[in-house]
Amino acid sequence: EQETENVGEDFILQEIIHNQFANKEYEATEQALRDFLSINHSKDAIDRGTFYLGETLLYQGKYQQALSCFLQVQDRFPDLTTRWIQVALDGYQLPTSSY
């Protein structure tokens, strides 16, 4: 039963990535991934969904939210997240105050 559940999770994630993310429909991808992550899934599926959400947020310029996603899965995907964390940090700038 666990294996069947994992196959279903994999299928849903791949559908989101191939049908929306690949077509640069980032707002739709973000919503689909947030919906996916709101349901109880395996740790592996949650980690992958969180990573994909980070990428989606990054492409929308939501650097702080993207950074948060990448930091959540940094231990799981160290090689992949290192680059994306740096990109998010480069894009994210603290607001400057003028005195």
Enumerate the language-model features and the residues they cover.
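Surface-exposed, polar/charged faces of alpha-helical domains
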Residues: 27, 31, 44, 63-68, ...
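Alpha-helical linker/edge segments of TPR/alpha-solenoid repeat scaffolds
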Residues: 55-68, 88-99
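Long, contiguous interaction/recruitment modules in multidomain scaffold/adaptor proteins
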Residues: 1-5
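TPR/TPR-like alpha-solenoid helical repeat scaffolds
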Residues: 47-51, 79-98
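Alpha-helical segment of the N-proximal tetratricopeptide repeat
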Residues: 8-35, 39
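Short solvent-exposed coil/turn linkers within tandem alpha-helical repeat scaffolds
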Residues: 6, 39-45, 71-84
